[in-house]
Each structure stands twice: as C-alpha cells, then as structure tokens.
C-alpha cells in the first residue's frame, strides 16, 4: 500500500462517516483531503495523520471524538493492522507486512512516474534564474542558481507544471559600457579603466574581437564594435558553460528589446494614465507604497533615463503577456529590496502580487585544505563555474550546490567532494544506485528474477518483514511527498537529503538481507521478492537524481 493509497483510504473513511451520519458537516463547508506522513518515532506506527484535528471544528466534535470514529473505520481497511489514537487526536496507523511490502512492486511498476503528481497541472510557471550579466564568466553564486534553478524546474514539472526556463540577458546599461571600455583598453595594450573589468578573460575576449574584426581599432566607433562583439562572444561562452553543466534555457530574453520596441515607454504611459505615477523633484515616481513597498520608487530619473525598475515592470508584464501564471525570480542576496517593489509593480499594473515570487539565495564559499579559495585563474577576482567543475566534475558540483536550502550560506569542501567515501554525499547516493545495479546483475546470474518464465510476478509482500525492510519501505514511501513538498516550498534540497536517507537505509538493508542465496543454497521466493525491493530502490534513486540533474551510474 502506497502512502497515497492510504491517504485515499483515510479520506474515504471520513466521507463514509459523514454519509452514515456519524459526523455532521455544515452545508458549504469542504472537508480537507487526508494526508499521511511518516511519524518521527517509529514506535508510533508506520504512518500518521492529523485529519481528525483538521476537521474537528468543521463537524462540531472534539478531535479525539473524530479520531475514534475514524479509527474504527480504518481498522476495517484491508492491509491496516492497527490504528492508535494519540495525544489530542493523532491517528497512528500500522500496516501489516503484506500491505507495507506491496509498495516495492508498485514502485517498480510505476517506474519513472513514481513520485510525480498533478498538483500543478495546468499552471504555466516562468522561472528566471542565473541571468548573469554578459561581462564575465559565471561566478560561484550564478553556478548555485544554475544548479538549484534547473533542479527546481524539474521538481515543478514533476508536479505537472509547464515550466519556462528563462535567462534575462542584461545587454542594456552601465555594466555593458564598462565591459566594452575594458575590452577596448586591453586591445590597445592599456590598463583597464578604474571601474572596468580585469582578469585574463578580458584579454582573451579582446583578442577574439580583433580576430573577428581586424580593423576594429580604426573603426568609426571602436567601443561600439567591442561592445557588440564582446557581449556576443561572452554570452556564447556563458551558454556553452551552462550547457556543459546540464542547464539549458527555453528563452534568452534581451533586456534591450524592452527599450528598442517601445515596451517600456508604452508601460510608463499606461501607469501615468492610471495615476500610478506622479512627478516630483524632476523625476517620475511609482506610487509603490500604496501597494506594500517601504517607499515610492523612481521610474524615470531626472535626466530622463529610465531607472532599473522601469525595465523590471515591463519585463514582468511581458512574461504575463506570454502566458505565465506565476513568475518566479531567483535573485542574489543583494536583491532583498526587489521583493516588495516587484509585487508593488504588479499591483500598480492591476495584476495580482501573488503572480510574483522571489527566491533569495545566499553566498557560496569554496574551501580546500581548510582555507577559502578566493581567486580564479581566468577571472582574476572570483571563482567561476569552470573552476568548480574542473576540480569536482558536474555531478558533484550540481549535487553539492543543490543539497542546501538557498537561504543559507554554504561552504563547499573540495577535498570532501573529490573523495570516494561515504562522507562525500554525492558519492554516497550514486554508490547506492550502482550497488542496486550490481545486486540486480548478481541476482540474474544466480537465477533470481522478478518474474517467472511465463512473466508472472514472483513476489510475496508478506516476506518483506525484516526490520531493515520496514525502514527501507518507509523511506521509499515518503519519496512522493518529499517531491511534492520540494515543489510547494521551492526547495529541491529536500530531494537530495531524502536520497541520502534512502541510500543509508539501503546500505543497512544490504548488510542484513540477502537477495541471492548463500553458497549453494536454493533460490526461494524471498529472494525474488527482495529483488523487487532492490529494484524499487534503484528506481527511486534514479528518479531523484534525475530531478537534481545528476547521473545515476550503474557501475562505480
């Protein structure tokens, strides 16, 4: 029995109790769908639900009264061994071995679909992440967003959402001008401007521009030549780095297009006509305090140029016009102020602030030999995506950056990530998957198979009764809810942490329970049955690693 099946059984018991008149619901009041979760204390059963406490007020009864009514009905559900009432109204449910073990067969039969859901079906989500300026290689913070953003997209898709991965290409503004001046200075053999960019990559890009445009220094506007060609070259490198990292985008949106085709000006006129802007001190201001911001924001500066927020507002409207139901922005730690202003901008447009969601990420530090790694050979100032991948590889880089909550600062220990040991989390999980594959190969050689020659399953769920098997089945059963929560809370690290727990449960089971007979012993039904459990673990590990964009090796 899967957790979803048990949850449905609890909900059915609740509806049956209402239909039988044991519980009375006021007209127009909807009862919640019951959900079961794994209790922290295994002595409290296999699964627990708080549904009695959730519905008590709606039916005018105490939580324990509701729990008593539900427990009597649940006890009659096939596969349920015992139902205990605890505390204010918790229902602790223990399944019999056959019902619990049936999960192994269910997982294998569902395959890659196990852990997916439809909670977000029909929802189009625009997920913008990385969006690094094309003025240099992707730094470590952008690398974290690449790993987390792509994993979040996969998790949201696993819950049925249509996700548009979008990269906002900032090719408008002062930073691009500084980049162009830096390239031009290096091409002329001069020092970089005081506010310019340094690093070997500037020299490399400058030389590439000269190779493409030999007469660039003698052109009518050398800086414009270096700006246009340099941005194109740098962005091509960024795209290539992301692709090698396993991250590809559906849309690369050019900021400059918002200004070139008049979207910003049209938007500002719309805001003026709706009295959402006012003129003061020579500038145009957005009445953002009326929509929850801590202060009004300048939209058109006193020099007549648009402030950054003008482009941000136009960009949000553009996303909505393209069909996004929800716009998720993944921004760095220095962008906390954007949350309120983007929501205020949405409200000023007459849109819902709930259509804007901002995730703020914190800093990443690399450590080697106990010391912080601060310099990049190529960039000259910060550690880049290429620096990290060169040392640990794509899998370890993506996994290590995704296994932490984005709102926490993290230290990545390069020494740990290059070790083939259990203290290396990505190795620990990948090795568990490789071990399941090895067990399956050995089982095949020993004549242990999931089905007989006629294709009928060789499986008896009641034989999966060892305590280590109960633990392993519990970890398997939790996986769908972990994925659902990862989507709900925008926290793909939940998947990584659960895979580590599952890998641990599998390694302990491997040490305690044999899939193949010992020595010349005969193959028995328990061996065939355990192969189902082994393969269920393999499937869930593969499914979870895929959500993280990490490979699931068959041999290590």
Curated annotation (Swiss-Prot):
Keyword check for Aminoacyl-tRNA synthetase: yes
Keywords for the protein's UniProt record, in alphabetical order: Aminoacyl-tRNA synthetase, ATP-binding, Cytoplasm, Ligase, Nucleotide-binding, Protein biosynthesis
A cellular component term, taken from the record's GO annotations: cytoplasm
Residue interval(s) of motif 'HIGH' region: 132-142
Subcellular location per the Swiss-Prot or TrEMBL entry: Cytoplasm
EC number: 6.1.1.19
NCBIfam families associated with the record: argS
Subunit description: Monomer.
BP GO annotations: arginyl-tRNA aminoacylation
UniProt source species: Kocuria rhizophila (strain ATCC 9341 / DSM 348 / NBRC 103217 / DC2201)
Coiled-coil regions, chain positions: none
Disulphide-bridged cysteine pairs: none
PANTHER family: ARGININE--TRNA LIGASE, CYTOPLASMIC (PTHR11956:SF5), ARGINYL-TRNA SYNTHETASE (PTHR11956)
Main location: cytoplasm
UniProt-recorded name of the protein: Arginine--tRNA ligase
An example molecular function term from Gene Ontology annotations: arginine-tRNA ligase activity
Pfam families documented for this protein: Arg_tRNA_synt_N, DALR_1, tRNA-synt_1d
Reaction(s) this enzyme catalyzes, per UniProt: tRNA(Arg) + L-arginine + ATP = L-arginyl-tRNA(Arg) + AMP + diphosphate
Protein family membership: Belongs to the class-I aminoacyl-tRNA synthetase family.
């Amino acid at each position: 029995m899967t957790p979803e099946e048990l949850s449905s059984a609890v909900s059915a018991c609740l509806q049956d109790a209402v239909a039988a008149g044991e519980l009375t619901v006021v007209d127009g009041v909807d009862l919640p769908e019951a959900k079961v979760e794994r209790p922290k204390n295994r002595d409290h059963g296999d699964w627990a639900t708080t549904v009695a406490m959730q519905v008590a007020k709606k039916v005018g009864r105490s939580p324990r009264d509701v729990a008593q009514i539900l427990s009597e009905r649940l006890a009659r559900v096939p596969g349920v061994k015992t139902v205990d009432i605890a505390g204010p109204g918790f229902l602790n449910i223990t399944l019999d071995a056959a019902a619990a073990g049936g999960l192994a067969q269910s997982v294998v039969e569902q395959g890659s679909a196990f852990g997916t859901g439809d909670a977000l079906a029909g929802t189009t989500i625009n997920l913008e992440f990385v969006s690094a300026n094309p003025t240099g290689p992707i730094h470590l913070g952008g690398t974290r967003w690449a790993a987390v953003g792509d994993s979040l997209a996969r998790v949201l898709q696993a819950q049925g959402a249509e996700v548009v991965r979008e990269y906002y290409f900032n090719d408008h503004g002062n930073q691009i001008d500084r980049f162009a001046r830096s390239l031009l200075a290096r091409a002329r053999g001069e020092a970089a401007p005081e506010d310019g960019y340094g690093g070997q990559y500037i020299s490399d890009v400058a030389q590439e521009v000269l190779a493409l445009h030999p007469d660039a220094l003698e052109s009518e506007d050398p800086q414009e030549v270096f700006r246009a060609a340099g941005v194109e070259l740098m962005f091509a490198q960024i795209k290539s780095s992301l692709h090698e990292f396993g991250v590809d985008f559906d849309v690369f949106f050019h900021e400059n297009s918002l200004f070139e085709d008049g979207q910003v000006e049209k938007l500002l006129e719309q805001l003026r006509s709706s009295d959402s802007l006012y003129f003061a001190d020579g500038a145009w201001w957005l009445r953002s305090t009326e929509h929850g911001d801590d202060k009004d924001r300048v939209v058109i500066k006193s020099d007549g140029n648009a402030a950054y927020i003008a482009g941000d507002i136009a960009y949000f409207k553009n996303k909505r016009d393209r069909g996004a139901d929800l716009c998720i922005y993944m921004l760095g730690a220095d962008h906390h102020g954007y949350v309120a202003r983007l929501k205020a901008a949405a409200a000023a447009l007459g849109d819902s602030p709930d259509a804007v969601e901002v995730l703020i990420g914190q800093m990443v530090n690399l450590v080697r030999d106990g010391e912080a790694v601060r310099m990049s050979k190529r960039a000259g100032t910060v550690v880049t995506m290429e620096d990290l991948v060169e040392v640990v590889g794509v899998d370890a880089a993506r996994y290590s950056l995704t296994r932490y909550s984005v709102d926490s600062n993290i230290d990545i220990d390069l020494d740990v990530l290059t070790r083939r040991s259990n203290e290396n989390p990505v190795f620990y999980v990948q090795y568990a998957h490789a071990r399941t594959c090895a067990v399956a190969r050995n089982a095949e050689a020993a004549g242990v198979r999931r089905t007989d020659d006629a294709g009928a399953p060789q499986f008896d769920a009641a034989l999966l009764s060892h305590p280590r098997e109960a633990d392993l089945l519990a970890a398997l059963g939790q996986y769908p809810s972990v994925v659902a929560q990862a989507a709900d809370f925008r926290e793909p690290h939940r998947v990584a942490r659960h895979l580590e727990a599952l890998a641990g449960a599998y390694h302990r089971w491997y040490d305690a329970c044999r899939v193949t007979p010992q020595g010349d012993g005969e193959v028995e039904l328990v061996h065939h049955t355990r192969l189902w459990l082994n393969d269920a673990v393999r499937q869930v590990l593969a499914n979870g690693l895929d959500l993280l964009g990490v490979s699931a090796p068959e041999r290590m």
